[in-house]
């Protein structure tokens, strides 16, 4: 009979009965490809705390790197403050994403991470994770894969801002969200925007007025339906074409 003591220990220390083995987004996160023994070792270092409330920050720019954060539910935005004191959003993180990679190179966070809605995160002490990854090749490979995905996303964002017009930027943003929701088991055609239009405009380098005008244009063209923060994609193929995504790269 398998002992349940380690699990009991995790529940007491983390305050939550959900473990990596039971997590619905584990295939997108660090646990992917790990065997049961490796999962148990990872599970024992993860801290699961109370929900992060809307507006609450996981960390601030300048904070020492102590942990990486795996999002279990909710949405987190990453942003920096420019020399002029303006906020610049650099990423929107969904369930399954790992936040904090950019702090590894300098041992401190160069950006802020703030919850856009009530969110649940798994806090993973970085030094212990780094030590474990040296002993577990599969864990190291998965961390590298997650880092690679983040670099790929940054490259796509550079292309988006430098080569695409306003209409193409918003279409690409919505198509990307649709794809990410689908990967997480949610509907790729119906979803709620957890970020404001101001946040979207900030991220895409567009004004709030431009975002609102384009959403109205997309709705008039029957590409999508907009009801407040709720988006329904009516013509996925047309949105995909407008976003500049080929069927081969889908």
Curated annotation (Swiss-Prot):
Residues 84 are annotated as: Activating region 3B. Residues 115 are annotated as: Activating region 3D. CDD domains: CAP_ED, HTH_CRP. Binds 1 [4Fe-4S] cluster per subunit. Residues 88-90 are annotated as: Activating region 3C. Residues 119-124 are annotated as: Activating region 1B. Residues 126-127 are annotated as: Activating region 2B. NCBIfam families: PRK11161.1. Global transcription factor that controls the expression of over 100 target genes in response to anoxia. It facilitates the adaptation to anaerobic growth conditions by regulating the expression of gene products that are involved in anaerobic energy metabolism. When the terminal electron acceptor, O(2), is no longer available, it represses the synthesis of enzymes involved in aerobic respiration and increases the synthesis of enzymes required for anaerobic respiration. This is Fumarate and nitrate reduction regulatory protein.
